[in-house]
Amino acid sequence: MTQANPRDLLQALFAAAVNAAQPEHCIPRFLPAPPKGRTLVIGAGKASAAMARVLEQHWPGELSGLVVTRYGYAVPCERIEIVEAAHPVPDAAGREAAGRMLALAQGLGPDDLVICLISGGGSALLPLPGEGVSLEDKQAINRALLKSGATIAEMNCVRRHLSAIKGGRLAAACHPARVLNLLISDVPGDNPMDIASGPTVADPTTCADALAIVRRYAIDLPAGARALLESGRGETVKPGDPRLAGVETHLIATPQMALEAAAEVARAAGVTPVLLGDSIEGEARDVGKVMAAIALQVKRHGQPVAAPCVLLSGGETTVTVRGNGRGGRNVEFLLALAVALDGAAGIHAVAGDTDGVDGLEEIAGALATPDTLSRAWARGIRPRDSLDNNDGHGFFEALGDSLVTGPTLTNVNDFRAILIR
């Protein structure tokens, strides 16, 4: 396949990574027996509606609940209510759903079970502001964080301390019921407190940590948000809190699982897979330059492995926005990679977000080929100018190389594959 059509193989690798994280493949084995009391289902994230549907299909007892997902990501459920809200910048629909979810958690008993279906995107989908913070404040802070270059862990630390539901608060509200967390990880390192900002797990970080991040990236906090952090009133639920004693957490799908699934497809095609890491962070364009150097070392010297091979990686890079183009971290990475490769023969690549959305575009990512730069120049497009303007989507769309999947109904972060023949 690699000799005939590298593009087909790269798309097959991406599809395998996404398929490995589909809820129907990873939820059933984690389900317990029904409890003596009620079963309440709550959740948030881009994959959470699909998770709810699978849970309904495999749950033998009664259940009810509420799950919030991104617009366009709802799927039909019979017993669990699905609500759609905005992502990545939150809206009133998400705020209302978060408030209702917190209310549903009240009054549960020790014989009840709460199943929490949490996946990436839940931070924006549960925007219940803390004391003195408005939804408009949270929207402004979220926009600033997204443009700042902060890591996802840093962004979520700030979000947790400005929230009335994140940072373990939702789990604390469920006490004394038993809480079962089923998490699909979209964050480097798979730390549960960073997945959807950890609404149902303890948080060891502090308001002081959040303030330090705000200062580091020069985020202009509204007065109410600053007061909440400086006073310590935004403190989260800490490890050892007795209200979380009945919480059990399982990571049911992770970026590493997705990479391993793609590696199997590569081996079947006669290509050696090299897994470089499932939690790579850093500026997207810098990561692109480093990956290009590794690919060129393989091509020129057969190190660390000989071609044909494919370099696989995951994680979540960042983009410090300086231009006004249509960008996203995956297309920023890929454009920087293409520029650094400078048309090197025999090297093709794909980069995409496994949820189908890179940045603010309904586009998962893109593909790059050895003639990417020459085709751009032929159309009057200057690749370095596009990179400087953070216009990765505009660049690859003009070449017909966008990767468009639609809603994938899962999310295990970014997927990158560099095929060297």
Summary of predicted features, one role per range:
Residues V68-P110, V158-R159:
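Glycine-rich oxoanion-binding loops at beta->alpha junctions
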Residues V54-L63, R79-E81, Q106, P129-A140, ...:
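A glycine- and small-aliphatic-rich helix-loop capping segment at beta-alpha/alpha-beta transitions
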Residues M1-I42, A50-M51:
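An N-terminal, well-structured beta->alpha segment
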Residues A177-L180, A202-A292:
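Accessory alpha-helical/coil subdomains and C-terminal extensions
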Residues G270-A351:
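Active-site segments that bind and position negatively charged phosphate/pyrophosphate groups
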Residues V133-A150, D203-A218, G323-A349:
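Gly/Ser/Thr-rich active-site loops/lids in small-molecule metabolic enzymes
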Residues Q106-D194, P199-A202, D388-D391, F395, ...:
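Glycine-rich, mobile lid/loop segments that gate access to catalytic sites or pores
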Residues L334-R421:
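Internal helix-turn-beta structural module
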